[in-house]
Amino acid sequence: MFRKLGSSGSLWKPKNPHSLEYLKYLQGVLTKNEKVTENNKKILVEALRAIAEILIWGDQNDASVFDFFLERQMLLYFLKIMEQGNTPLNVQLLQTLNILFENIRHETSLYFLLSNNHVNSIISHKFDLQNDEIMAYYISFLKTLSFKLNPATIHFFFNETTEEFPLLVEVLKLYNWNESMVRIAVRNILLNIVRVQDDSMIIFAIKHTKEYLSELIDSLVGLSLEMDTFVRSAENVLANRERLRGKVDDLIDLIHYIGELLDVEAVAESLSILVTTRYLSPLLLSSISPRRDNHSLLLTPISALFFFSEFLLIVRHHETIYTFLSSFLFDTQNTLTTHWIRHNEKYCLEPITLSSPTGEYVNEDHVFFDFLLEAFDSSQADDSKAFYGLMLIYSMFQNNADVGELLSAANFPVLKESTTTSLAQQNLARLRIASTSSISKRTRAITEIGVEATEEDEIFHDVPEEQTLEDLVDDVLVDTENSAISDPEPKNVESESRSRFQSAVDELPPPSTSGCDGRLFDALSSIIKAVGTDDNRIRPITLELACLVIRQILMTVDDEKVHTSLTKLCFEVRLKLLSSIGQYVNGENLFLEWFEDEYAEFEVNHVNFDIIGHEMLLPPAATPLSNLLLHKRLPSGFEERIRTQIVFYLHIRKLERDLTGEGDTELPVRVLNSDQEPVAIGDCINLHNSDLLSCTVVPQQLCSLGKPGDRLARFLVTDRLQLILVEPDSRKAGWAIVRFVGLLQDTTINGDSTDSKVLHVVVEGQPSRIKKRHPVLTAKFIFDDHIRCMAAKQRLTKGRQTARGLKLQAICSALGVPRIDPATMTSSPRMNPFRIVKGCAPGSVRKTVSTSSSSSQGRPGHYSANLRSASRNAGMIPDDPTQPSSSSERRS
């Protein structure tokens, strides 16, 4: 049953490693090897590992294991091993203790381990912390112990009589360690300590953490200044954005940690004072007011607004937020009494010494709030200040510190608890009732299905964490539209929806007026107005955020004058944008793709400050080489300018419809008066009256048809809008099963240079909120002869032109622009005045005289019929390869 352990004299090792006898054997190993040597080092390492394993087993299966462990005081052997300073054994010992305390589940077992003072002795032991491996296991061990702290266990660590708390004392020595992993662990340990409800321990902790909390806020100041210095000099390129993201992540993590500490009542008061007097006032507020001392360290206004916004989005402590916002909204610059300066390569907080009279600043009321309003000045070089000013207003709405009364006192629109179920719901219902009831009757149009049926089945679930009123503003339409699609009788849905919302309006009390600073409304309106100018520097994300903030204000302000003036402004700006983009609807062959892509992008909510806040700190990029999406940068070139104006138009149009309560039945664009249901994969269709073309389809990529290289016998059939591949139904003569369906408008057809019987066909999928435009079918269509190939190409080409024409007609109807036949157009607003003419000598050119109608100038919504040359950007399909001569055919 036993076998002798060769190096341990009379010790015999049991076969069962999970037994009390095995622990007794291990205790004997430790007893026989109290002095560490090179010969027994490996034995001790294995013994420590085995002890942790058997103690975890005993915790769950046999209480006598812990009884024996405590009776023989085996932790004392651990201390003796540690005191000998052998690094490998110390590493193994710390790892053993960490595993042991991590896996103990029963409180009784935990109490047994903590019942003597050996754990505190291990915590206080002077390990070689310069060794990275020891430091990693040591800080992990301390962190594991901190998670075991509670009112019942705290007195195993804290001795109230002698005022000894080794865990806290040793951790505080590491708060400024050079490795970020250690600093983060220290923060977590201290947070776990101060969360324990024990009065005597809290008094001790507050006394010993004063310096730490002060250093914590100073590190926040240092991170802010360091990041601001980087932002001042860095270009907006991918590498710099990655570096900036790391700096922002560190700063936001620190703000989150401070916010969690502020939620702990024991340290909230002292920490709140430190945050206000060392960070918020001397750094942030000083940076958004006129400079009063040349030695002051100030942030750029953009950085200050960003940090201010992040602080409001994260921190929920009422006293801190209340103090900060009251200073921001009401105080003068005279309240700033300290500032940060640099002294001997260090940051120091000192009182402000005024070298000259400051009367022009001292008596200026609301200097900080006035700065916020000035951030929306459209004459600035870029929209960075405007974006972060909007972010600040948005964060005020989102903050959970219950400061609504303070904001109301400053004529800042805010939802009060008493009005949440009255005015907010009333304005929401009034804004949306007309659009909801009218859109609820929309059925799914043939061009809206795109080619979802051709892709792999995917289910996307959006589960919002919290449904807020601003979310409801955007979601009412979606919910009602989805119910209309699923209901076979849309009329019933419309009546039910209208009656539901109408009854909600009838039951609401009369509206109450909520005050709004007129200057704030004018400042926000200036962004809308700037969008209508040709030389504006507004990015789409800024306009999107502005529309969101305006909607939030309209939820609380029931002022008819405000609604009327904003509606009028949106109408004027929409007409200006329409006059700019409307002339390209008929003149640009790719306008259809531009509009559909930007509408899909428009439906995506980009206002997510977890991923966009830091990117806007750098100077605005104006080139695709920056790797930024278009909505986050300035446009470059003709196409991007038109795309940006399309997005502007969509946002202004949506805001205007929300203000007037009109339903938008034209968007998303769809072909009107469709006389047939869209075909989907798996449908069985009647082909008695259809013209079929037999072909072999060879996919070039994985798709719904099959794998690349498969040869599939299919029949090609088209309708007005769709390309359909079918397989005959063996059960019904004249019927077929749909195997693929795509939109003709997104189909590209090319001949093959080596085989006249082959067509190369690419069908792209419609863009959506989830996916960009992408090919869903790339395949070769092989026909029996080149005549059938030519017939198929002609049919697909004509079908593509017809489908695109119908879709463009729908876009024109949605925009209110007359549809013009491309064959009648003679000029384009951006046409190159020179073109190569066939038949000319090489290198010679003839100037094309561009003519345009001037009769329609100055009339909004009216556009010239002579927009562009029919040869410019026509939807041409490459010619077929040259066919073999008749003699060669006879030879073959």
Curated annotation (Swiss-Prot):
Highest taxon above the source species: Eukaryota
Domain FPL: 48-194
Annotated region (Disordered), positions in chain: 844-892
Entry's Gene Ontology cellular component terms: Golgi apparatus
GO biological process: autophagy; endosomal transport; regulation of autophagosome maturation; vacuolar transport
InterPro entries: ARM-type_fold, CLEC16A/TT9, CLEC16A/TT9_C, CLEC16A/TT9_N
Keyword DNA-binding attributed: no
Pfam families from the UniProt entry: CLEC16A_C (PF19439), FPL (PF09758)
Listed Polar residues bias regions: 882-892
Compositional bias per record (Low complexity), positions renumbered to this chain: 844-856
Similarity-based family: Belongs to the CLEC16A/gop-1 family.
Protein role: Regulator of mitophagy.
Protein's recorded name: Protein CLEC16A homolog
Gene, per the UniProt record: gop-1
